[in-house]
Protein backbone atom coordinates (compact mmCIF):
# COMPACT_ATOMS: atom_id res chain seq x y z
CA UNK A 1 0.00 0.00 0.00
CA UNK A 2 2.70 2.52 0.98
CA UNK A 3 4.46 2.17 -2.35
CA UNK A 4 1.29 3.14 -4.18
CA UNK A 5 0.82 6.16 -1.92
CA UNK A 6 4.43 7.28 -2.51
CA UNK A 7 4.01 6.84 -6.26
CA UNK A 8 0.87 9.00 -6.16
CA UNK A 9 2.69 11.67 -4.10
CA UNK A 10 5.57 11.61 -6.61
CA UNK A 11 3.08 12.11 -9.46
CA UNK A 12 1.21 14.93 -7.71
CA UNK A 13 4.45 16.72 -6.78
CA UNK A 14 5.61 16.45 -10.40
CA UNK A 15 2.35 17.56 -12.01
CA UNK A 16 1.76 20.48 -9.62
CA UNK A 17 5.37 21.72 -9.64
CA UNK A 18 5.56 25.51 -9.20
CA UNK A 19 9.11 25.48 -10.58
CA UNK A 20 8.02 23.89 -13.86
CA UNK A 21 4.28 23.40 -14.38
CA UNK A 22 3.40 20.30 -16.39
CA UNK A 23 1.87 22.51 -19.08
CA UNK A 24 5.48 23.47 -19.97
CA UNK A 25 6.24 19.84 -20.77
CA UNK A 26 9.51 18.32 -19.61
CA UNK A 27 12.29 20.52 -21.03
CA UNK A 28 15.88 19.53 -20.33
CA UNK A 29 17.37 21.78 -17.62
CA UNK A 30 21.00 21.69 -16.48
CA UNK A 31 21.21 21.20 -12.70
CA UNK A 32 23.58 20.20 -9.92
CA UNK A 33 24.66 16.52 -10.02
CA UNK A 34 25.19 14.80 -6.69
CA UNK A 35 26.00 11.50 -5.01
CA UNK A 36 24.31 9.94 -2.02
CA UNK A 37 25.34 7.23 0.44
CA UNK A 38 22.48 5.71 2.42
CA UNK A 39 22.45 3.52 5.50
CA UNK A 40 19.13 1.75 6.11
CA UNK A 41 17.29 -0.62 8.35
CA UNK A 42 15.33 -3.19 6.34
CA UNK A 43 11.74 -3.78 7.46
CA UNK A 44 9.79 -6.82 6.28
CA UNK A 45 6.25 -7.55 7.49
CA UNK A 46 6.57 -5.04 10.36
CA UNK A 47 9.89 -6.45 11.65
CA UNK A 48 13.43 -5.09 11.26
CA UNK A 49 15.23 -7.96 9.51
CA UNK A 50 18.56 -6.41 8.56
CA UNK A 51 20.54 -3.50 7.17
CA UNK A 52 21.21 -2.07 3.72
CA UNK A 53 23.90 0.10 2.16
CA UNK A 54 22.94 2.11 -0.92
CA UNK A 55 24.79 4.34 -3.39
CA UNK A 56 22.91 6.74 -5.67
CA UNK A 57 24.10 9.12 -8.37
CA UNK A 58 21.87 11.89 -9.71
CA UNK A 59 22.68 13.35 -13.12
CA UNK A 60 23.47 16.93 -14.14
CA UNK A 61 20.07 17.47 -15.76
CA UNK A 62 16.40 17.58 -14.99
CA UNK A 63 13.48 16.95 -17.30
CA UNK A 64 10.98 19.49 -16.15
CA UNK A 65 10.86 19.12 -12.37
CA UNK A 66 12.33 15.59 -12.16
CA UNK A 67 16.01 14.66 -11.94
CA UNK A 68 17.15 11.26 -13.25
CA UNK A 69 19.52 9.03 -11.37
CA UNK A 70 20.63 5.49 -10.80
CA UNK A 71 21.17 3.49 -7.65
CA UNK A 72 22.51 0.22 -6.30
CA UNK A 73 22.01 -1.31 -2.86
CA UNK A 74 23.05 -4.44 -1.01
CA UNK A 75 21.68 -5.84 2.25
CA UNK A 76 23.56 -7.66 4.99
CA UNK A 77 21.92 -10.87 3.66
CA UNK A 78 23.34 -10.32 0.16
CA UNK A 79 20.12 -9.04 -1.41
CA UNK A 80 21.02 -6.81 -4.35
CA UNK A 81 18.88 -4.14 -6.01
CA UNK A 82 19.89 -1.87 -8.89
CA UNK A 83 17.75 0.56 -10.79
CA UNK A 84 17.25 3.87 -12.49
CA UNK A 85 14.55 6.45 -11.99
CA UNK A 86 13.73 9.99 -10.90
CA UNK A 87 13.63 12.23 -7.85
CA UNK A 88 11.37 15.27 -7.40
CA UNK A 89 12.49 17.87 -4.85
CA UNK A 90 10.08 20.31 -3.21
CA UNK A 91 11.71 23.28 -1.45
CA UNK A 92 10.06 23.86 1.92
CA UNK A 93 12.59 26.43 3.14
CA UNK A 94 16.03 27.74 2.14
CA UNK A 95 17.74 24.60 3.47
CA UNK A 96 14.88 22.09 3.79
CA UNK A 97 13.42 19.94 1.02
CA UNK A 98 10.78 17.26 0.79
CA UNK A 99 11.77 14.72 -1.86
CA UNK A 100 9.80 12.02 -3.65
CA UNK A 101 11.48 9.30 -5.70
CA UNK A 102 10.48 6.47 -8.01
CA UNK A 103 13.03 3.89 -9.21
CA UNK A 104 12.20 0.69 -11.13
CA UNK A 105 14.95 -1.90 -10.83
CA UNK A 106 16.22 -5.46 -10.69
CA UNK A 107 16.15 -7.44 -7.42
CA UNK A 108 18.48 -10.38 -6.80
CA UNK A 109 17.32 -12.17 -3.65
CA UNK A 110 20.41 -14.14 -2.50
CA UNK A 111 19.70 -14.94 1.21
CA UNK A 112 17.35 -11.94 1.55
CA UNK A 113 13.56 -12.19 1.89
CA UNK A 114 11.46 -13.43 -1.03
CA UNK A 115 9.69 -10.50 -2.67
CA UNK A 116 7.98 -12.62 -5.33
CA UNK A 117 9.99 -11.69 -8.41
CA UNK A 118 12.96 -9.91 -9.94
CA UNK A 119 11.43 -6.59 -11.08
CA UNK A 120 10.91 -4.23 -8.13
CA UNK A 121 9.74 -0.64 -7.94
CA UNK A 122 11.16 1.58 -5.19
CA UNK A 123 9.30 4.68 -4.14
CA UNK A 124 9.91 6.84 -1.13
CA UNK A 125 9.55 10.09 0.72
CA UNK A 126 12.55 11.94 2.15
CA UNK A 127 13.17 15.00 4.34
CA UNK A 128 16.48 16.64 3.41
CA UNK A 129 18.49 19.36 5.17
CA UNK A 130 21.19 21.21 3.22
CA UNK A 131 24.47 21.93 5.03
CA UNK A 132 26.35 24.61 3.11
CA UNK A 133 26.86 24.38 -0.65
CA UNK A 134 28.20 20.83 -0.87
CA UNK A 135 26.51 18.60 1.70
CA UNK A 136 23.07 17.53 2.88
CA UNK A 137 21.66 14.95 5.26
CA UNK A 138 18.27 13.28 5.07
CA UNK A 139 15.94 10.75 6.60
CA UNK A 140 13.53 8.76 4.47
CA UNK A 141 11.05 5.92 4.29
CA UNK A 142 11.08 3.75 1.18
CA UNK A 143 8.87 0.94 -0.15
CA UNK A 144 9.91 -1.72 -2.64
CA UNK A 145 7.57 -4.18 -4.34
CA UNK A 146 6.63 -5.64 -7.70
CA UNK A 147 3.47 -3.56 -8.01
CA UNK A 148 1.48 -6.83 -8.14
CA UNK A 149 3.26 -8.11 -11.27
CA UNK A 150 3.52 -11.45 -9.46
CA UNK A 151 0.95 -13.20 -7.27
CA UNK A 152 3.22 -13.07 -4.23
CA UNK A 153 4.08 -9.42 -3.53
CA UNK A 154 4.77 -8.83 0.18
CA UNK A 155 6.85 -5.66 -0.26
CA UNK A 156 9.81 -4.45 1.76
CA UNK A 157 10.49 -1.13 3.46
CA UNK A 158 13.67 0.69 4.43
CA UNK A 159 14.15 3.39 7.04
CA UNK A 160 17.01 5.44 5.64
CA UNK A 161 19.64 7.95 6.74
CA UNK A 162 21.59 9.55 3.89
CA UNK A 163 24.56 11.80 3.35
CA UNK A 164 24.71 13.60 -0.01
CA UNK A 165 27.47 15.60 -1.69
CA UNK A 166 27.17 17.87 -4.71
CA UNK A 167 29.62 17.10 -7.50
CA UNK A 168 31.57 20.20 -8.44
Per-region residue spans from a language model:
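Repeated loop/turn-to-beta-strand initiation elements of outer-membrane beta-barrel proteins
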Residues: 35, 61-68, 94-98, 133-139
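Transmembrane beta-barrel strands of outer-membrane/channel proteins
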Residues: 37-43, 53, 57, 68-74, ...
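Membrane-embedded beta-strand positions in outer-membrane beta-barrel channels/transporters
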Residues: 52-56, 83-85, 124, 160-162
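Outer-membrane beta-barrel translocator/channel fold
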Residues: 99-156
Amino acid sequence: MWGGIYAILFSIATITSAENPVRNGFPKIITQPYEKITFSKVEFQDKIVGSELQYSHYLDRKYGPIQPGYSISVTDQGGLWLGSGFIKKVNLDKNIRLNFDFFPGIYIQSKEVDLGGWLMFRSGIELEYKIGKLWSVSIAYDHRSSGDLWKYNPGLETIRFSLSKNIM
